[in-house]
Amino acid sequence: MKIRLDQYLVQHGLIQSRERAKAMIMSGVVFVNEQKVDKAGEMIKEDAKVEVRGHDIGYVSRGGLKLEKAMQCFPLTPKGKVCMDIGASTGGFTDCMLQNGAVKVYAVDVGYGQLAWSLRTDERVVNMERTNIRNVTLDQLAEPIEFFSVDVSFISLHHIFPVVQAITTPDAMGVCLVKPQFEAGREKVGKNGVVRDPATHREVLHNAMGYAAANGFKVCGLDFSPVKGPEGNIEYLMFVQKSDEPGALDDSVAEQVVASSHSTLDR
């Protein structure tokens, strides 16, 4: 059985809308069985290997697609809010926040010179490069953060949540990218830094939800990232909000999300 390529991308959670799917296909960043396809109406087999590559996706990097999916799946928006992009890198999340109405974005990253020029020169962006989020305090900011995203590498969310708790407003909400390769024990990380075991993914999500709850956040939603991380790691989106009643979702939710992620992305 065959299906239109643009329809396939939406149905499998790789892109959020047919309009965006058509634009990305036409831009030449969609590959089917290792071959570039630039026609949205191309009919492909259901079991074809489909990948979205490159950065011509409406944002300065793929991070924008991750936040875009989170906003589609969860009741959250940066519109009218002071935001922070933790682990900004080139600024995909920052770009998505601005395109969706953020009034200011603090772009935080330990690196230097990575933030896209279009964002470096945007007066709504506060470029906090060469900055370790673990050292950031409220005194360094003009105001507390209302909306945040976390996309960090080589560090666990266990170390991020105490800082986020201290610099955010009482009703702050955010999206955290949960990366099994940086959350799992070293013995559970496979060749090339890839974590493939669904059981490890479930354990990682359970722990990540615990870190959030322990720091005054309620976990309101889980889903998987529409694009894999480096080396092909499946990663997850966790929607959290500060709450007087912090807590995690039932582990059965994590189990369902992990199963869905593998059936969709490990094709």
Language model segments and positions:
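Glycine-rich SAM-binding Motif I of class I
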Residues: 91-92, 113
